[in-house]
A protein has these predicted regions:
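Sec-dependent bacterial lipoprotein signal peptides
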Residues: 1-12
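Compositionally biased intrinsically disordered regions enriched in Thr/Gly
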Residues: 14-252
Length: 252
């Protein structure tokens, strides 16, 4: 079953611009087949701009959100269309792959564990904070495709509210920023991981800028995903550096 629901309108403060946003909510709950408990669960919740910015900027931002959530195969569709088509395609793939797996088990006289044929995908996107004319957007995706546990990946996008373009790390910082920014991130790593035992289990303490960052009035925050610098159990690690420490690294 596929359900679309338009969330209530809200205001996102973006510097001098008040950008109206809405949330696209989609849910899919699909049983693999009658008589079995295996199922597919999909939840999509994506904030996107709807007003108080130019149509060109709005479309550029929505296209970037659609691209990161659904991929190139759904380019050119608006968010609702992309969410619907992606969901339908994912349901079809689920049935094709898992029904074939079930047949293989049955052909060998085996009974698969229910977890092997369960699937979950949660796609969540939301605007966080702003800095000058830049609005940060965080996209989180959780996926489970059998096995011991699922995985979550966080990806940040930074939108120029004058053009709708995604600003990359190399475009935001001045050339040669890498070493000084890495030093600042390492200096604040312990604040992000205050527990000594957790700190000791990290893969490395020599972290570097990875292009995955958000901005706010307070500073910049880098996101390090599961397994990137620490074990899965620690989840994503967010390291923040105040502007006062890195202002000379930023392009004006």
């Amino acid at each position: 079953m596929l359900v679309f629901a338009g969330a209530a309108m809200m205001l996102a403060s973006c510097g001098e611009t008040s950008m109206k946003v809405e949330t696209l909510d989609t849910a899919v709950n699909e049983a693999l087949m009658a008589g079995r408990e295996d199922s597919l669960h999909v939840v999509i919740s994506l904030e996107y701009p709807v007003a108080n910015i130019s149509d060109e900027v709005r479309k550029a931002i929505c296209d970037s959100i659609s691209m990161i959530a659904f991929g190139q195969d759904y380019a050119g569709l608006d968010l609702k269309e992309a969410a619907g088509k992606w969901s339908a395609d994912y349901v079809r793939t689920y049935h094709n792959e898992c029904e074939e797996t079930l047949k293989l088990y049955e052909g060998n006289g085996d009974i698969p564990m229910s977890s092997e044929l369960n699937r979950e995908r949660y796609k969540t996107g939301y605007f966080t904070e702003t800095y000058k004319n830049i609005a940060s957007y965080t996209y989180e995706e959780y996926f489970y495709e059998g096995g011991a546990h699922g995985s979550t990946v966080e990806t940040a996008l930074n939108f120029d509210l004058e053009s709708g373009k995604v600003i990359t790390e190399a475009e935001f910082f001045k050339p040669g920023y890498e070493e000084k920014l890495a030093e600042a991130l390492m200096a604040h790593l312990r604040e992000a991981v205050p527990d000594q035992e957790s700190y000791d289990t990290m893969f490395t303490h020599e972290i570097k800028p990875n292009g995955n960052f958000t901005v706010s009035e307070q500073g910049v925050t880098y996101i390090y995903n599961q397994y990137e610098i620490a074990p899965y159990s620690m989840g994503a690690i967010h390291v923040s550096v105040p502007w006062d420490e890195i202002r000379d690294l930023i392009r004006e």
